[in-house]
């Protein structure tokens, strides 16, 4: 089986990266072909045959980045184009999606489904939920005070803005709420065939 593992970071950065490296290693031990797609980074430790990755995006630096932030978190044309190249080359049976929001965006999901339609191939999209992104714009189900919160459940993502849940910022929380509503409206997360929690 051919598996493409997608994660925004392809270098040691946290728990999801430890997870994808181990899953990939175990799949390879079982004889599966595994490649990776995400952002380029000088510390990248996994790859795909084409060495095709998106540019490294860090929203915490640079004034230009901050101006482009609202647009780049919603849809990445770069990610859509580059994952398509990797899909055409690898022709995966499964795409295992992990952390992708903000940098890679659901544009990759649309690109995978478009690839299926154009090639006639069936690709299963498996998503591992490393956080609460699908139901909570700030990923944590927690207010800035640390108080646990479930107010966004039931498609009520505007509560994120009301409580300034993302970095205690009304603007960032509004962007998170808008992002969640757009993906809800476009059924982006319904493109997953399987969700692992």
Segment roles from a protein language model:
Residues 7-13, 20, 24-77, 81-90:
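N-terminal strand-loop element at the rim of the active site
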